[in-house]
Amino acid sequence: MIETQSMPKPAATVESKSKLFQRITSIDILRALTMVLMIFVNDLWSLKNIPAWLEHVERGVDGIGLADVVFPAFLFIVGLSLPFAIDNRRKKGDSEGQLLMHVLTRTIALLVMGVFLVNGETINAAAMGMPKYLWYPLCCLSFILIWNVYPKTAKRSLVFIAKAVGIITLITLAIFYRGHHDDQITTFAPQWWGILGLIGWAYLASGLITVFSKNNFYIILGGWIFFALLSMVSHAGLLPHNNIISAIPDAIRGGTLAGLAMGGVLTSLIFQYYRKEKNNLGLTAVFLAFSAVLIGLSVITRPYWKLAKLGATPAWLFLCSAFTILAFLAIYWLADVKKKANWFNIIKPAGTDTLLCYLIPYFMYAIVNVTGAHLPEVLLTGGVGLLKSFLFALLCVLITGLLNRAGIKLKL
């Protein structure tokens, strides 16, 4: 039985603190693999004659493809990393107010990036005078200027100018933006917040609970149960319709996305506890049991609301959480227990600078559009096409690593 007091808290000694709160290799590797998969599945649109199970399942259909498990895995990993990040900041001396400000500023950054990227999907090139393939690199370059980790030796005036250029560029793009919806010209708006924006809202909910809970296992467990139940209540149409509830972003109000992130936080606390006890077999047993329960919950809820990413159903929440826990467990044994982390060195930049890696494809697609480059049909078809998309993902990781070495590294 796990007691509240014995759940992972900063240990009593400096030595045990350093062991408990060091960077976990398996989490970085899991994040890197997820990022590579995300780039890979996002490139599948360029291919034809590929297995349907690799792609997103259409809205309203009961089922998921590989592409439908990548985003929830990323949300889960956001939660998985949270206790380590918060504890490390506490070790550095951050107050509760500073921790809350950190969560809020990161949330705002993710929302800003998400909104700018999602507006690119509906841009009206004729009305704005700018094609989509120029909008994206301008936005991404601005993100880099604003959130790059500049060397301490850099002149403050130059850093200020770089950040100011990024901010002014984004403001200008937002002012002059023109999009389209149902044959109507639209202006800059949040829309559905985009992938990064949804991550931002889920991060806000799970981050605030993590900060206030101070690693209390039962508060975190209660938070996860709350969002899991909220997901079911929301899909059952039982949420009250009033201005207050409607004002809450759907990524939180719907329960599912925040539930994925909170599941990661809960898993992280369990992981910290058994790792501190050096009980890998106990950790394995608990993770397998937790995954089995989650799969069971997915099976139970699927007949009511289907298993679907588009709709963020409870069954999708439970099943994808189980998949991510099992993947994390396998990688932990391979990388941290068996010391085979070097097997994943080729994708390491995708785990340590994931945001920059996520932005690289926007530049790559822009280059292809500007140059008019076209690959032969054989490279866009079937198995050969899949290999092309996989190599494209690895190329994005390689570029991320090269940019890191050149001094470009993003941190929110």
Place the predicted regions along the sequence by residue.
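Alpha-helical transmembrane segments and their immediate juxtamembrane cytosolic regions
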Residues: 2-412
